[in-house]
Regions:
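Short, hydrophobic beta-strand segments
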Residues: 9, 47-54
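Amphipathic alpha-helical interaction surfaces in cytosolic regulatory modules
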Residues: 60, 65, 69-70, 90
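Canonical alpha-helical transmembrane segment with a positive-inside/aromatic-interface signature
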Residues: 1-41
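Conserved short beta-strand edge segments in small beta-sheet-based binding/regulatory domains
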Residues: 33-39, 66, 71-85
């Protein structure tokens, strides 16, 4: 589909959020496909780092998509990158 884009998405959320459903409505609006591929605890278990593989419906709405995620996760860290480009952290 023209304008769609594959992305690796990493989102940090507080342990109080249910990671299996917390972003479903946002994903259904902005992605044509999303798959949770990894869950990692961090900060002594008080945070979850979620890793997804997604396909954006419209790459031009990537910032809008990230803004919606930020509202939901309390403005914690989010990384959205092309596959293979955002997996190394400095």
């Amino acid at each position: 589909k023209a304008g769609s884009a594959e992305r690796d998405l990493k989102i940090v959320i507080p342990e109080s959020l249910s990671y299996d459903e917390v972003f479903n409505d946002i994903f259904s609006t902005y992605t044509s496909r999303h798959e949770l591929i990894r869950v990692k605890t961090t900060n002594m278990g008080s945070l979850f780092k979620l890793t997804y593989q997604i396909t954006l419906r419209d790459a031009r709405k990537e910032k809008e998509f990230i803004d919606k995620l930020r509202e939901r996760n309390g403005n914690l860290e989010i990384t959205c990158a092309r596959p293979g480009n955002g997996n190394v952290e400095i």
